[in-house]
Structure formats: structure tokens, C-alpha cells
Amino acid sequence: MKMKIQALVALVTLAAAPAFAQTEIKVSYQPALYWALPFYVATEKGWWAEVGLKPVFSTFPAGVPQIAASASKSWDVGGTGSVPAVLGAVRYNLLTIGLTNDESAGNALLATGAKADGFLKNPQSIKGQTIVLTANSTGDYAVQSCLAKWGLKKSDVTIKSMGQAEVISAMSSNNADLGGLWAPNIYTMEEKAGAKVICSGKDAGAIVPGALVARSEYAKEQPQNVAKFLAVYLRAWKWMSTHRAESVAMMKKFYDVGGVSISDASMNKEFDTRPVYDLAGQLKVMNRAAAGSDVDKWMTQIAEFMKATGTMPEVPPAAKYITDDFMKMIDKDPKLKAFANQAN
């Protein structure tokens, strides 16, 4: 998707959006996740109103039902995993408009405490085992990347798909020895059930980004709102990067609402192990000046994984659904750029 940036920049002005003239924007996400925290922070700080937006939130337990809901226009923009983002591009024409974070270390294969050491010493012993996970998710991608690292194929194990809550329940009750989880569910299993990470996406050399997405129809009709949405999200990360203690306190409240309770140490681990991108960082990883951008490469690798698993027939061209147009709109608008980069 290619847009005339200069023509659109004029549409993105903070001055034209006083607090009393807010435009509704439907935002979707998955609750109690690190990359969704900026939505909560921005709401608590009142930053949406500063750009003339009024968010209406909808939440989903995982990416597949989330992207399916876009077909009925129940949401306009949001955050999701990279695997559902690619699937959403193929099935529902969703655009990837930025990244939420690098969650390569936050998606992993875990084993129960009684079995973990054995699997770590001899990964080949996983052959023939059952792994419970959420299919077509970043957790699924991480698990299968780990299997490939050990020379194992999907056909070498039995995969049972279920929601993350069911994965936690199955492993906690010793009805499953191996499970694919994403943070903070990883920390819940470690702290409450003594499970251990035996391999993360990062360990397997897989880059697992989170994606900021938009319905293509909405993005075409309301490009200025998409840019403002991104600016609010970026400002929240910028603020959190310089206010760790307050951010952790807000994370605790946000996670509590989503039914997740983890230690302060694990909450800090979320910040320490999951890099995020400011405006300059987003533009850098989305820059196609060379032979394709980093984001193109990462998402195409994920698409190739999905094709190999039979989830979709072909790998979609990255340029068809990944666009930095809206990040560029922010960069071209002095007021919106200053807003996105504000750390206080």
C-alpha cells in the first residue's frame, strides 16, 4: 500500500483535535500482556484526548478470534501477535503498521518441573511426546522453531491446541508435560507450578515481533486517526522507558484486571527481555531502502512457517500488507512527532 505522504500529513494536526471534539476509534488487544500495557498507560494519562481520539476497547484471549472479529468491523486498529497478523493479512486484508515489541524471549516451550531437566539434557526425548499450545500463535511459532533447532519435526510430536488458560491448567494438573506459552503466562507457570523454560523463540534463533495492525478499509478512510493511534502508543513506550517504577505499578493493576498475578521480579523481566521501538526505531526496522526491511524479513519467515504447517497456501508479499506510511506521517508532522517522542 503506497500513499501520498505529503497530502496526508496535513490531516494530522493536534491543534485540530480539542478534548471536546474526540473521534471514536475502536482498539483491539489481548488483556494482561506486556505489549498491551501502553493502551492502559495512555488511557490513565489522558493522552488519547490530547490527539482528539476516544478509544473504545475490545479484548480477545488470542490472536485468531481477534483477527476474525475484524471482518465485522468490530475494531479499527490494535495490537496482536505476528502470526495472527500475517494470517489476518491473508484472510481479512489487515495491514501491519508497526511493531509492538520484540517478544522472541517471551514465547517459549515449557516443561513441568519433574520433566524439564530430562528434556534439557536430551531434547531428542521430546520425540513422541504431546505438546499443548495455542495453534497459529506466536507461541506455536516459537515451539516449532525450538523443535527445528533440535532436528525434530511437527510430525515427531503430538500437538494439542487449546487456549492459554487451558495450557496452564493441563500442565499444573500434570495432564501435560510440555506446553507452549507466552509471557506473562510463562512466569505464572514458573512461579505457581515450578515449570521451566526449556527453549524460547530467542534460543531457537527466531525473531518473534508483535504487530500493530489496522483494517485496510479503515486505514484508507481515516489515515490521520491511524497515525494518531500510533503516536499515542509510541508516547506510552517512551514514557515507560524513563518511569520504570511507576510503569511496573501500573502493569500490576493492568495484569490484575486480566486475572494475572506475577512477582515484581517477573514484571521487571518483561521490561528487561522485550525490546521496544520508538519512532526512529520503527522507521529503521521498516525501511525498505535496501533489499527489503527487517520487518519484511521477520514477517516473511513467519509466513513461510505458516505455509509449511498448512495454515495458508502461499506466502504473501510483504509489501502488500506491511506499510510504514503511517509512521512516516508522524515523522513528517512536527507536532505529532514531538508528541510521540515525549517522555514526560
Segments predicted by a language model, with ranges:
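Soluble non-cytosolic domains of exported or imported proteins
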Residues: 61-64, 79, 133, 137-138, ...
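Secondary-structure end/capping motifs
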Residues: 221-313
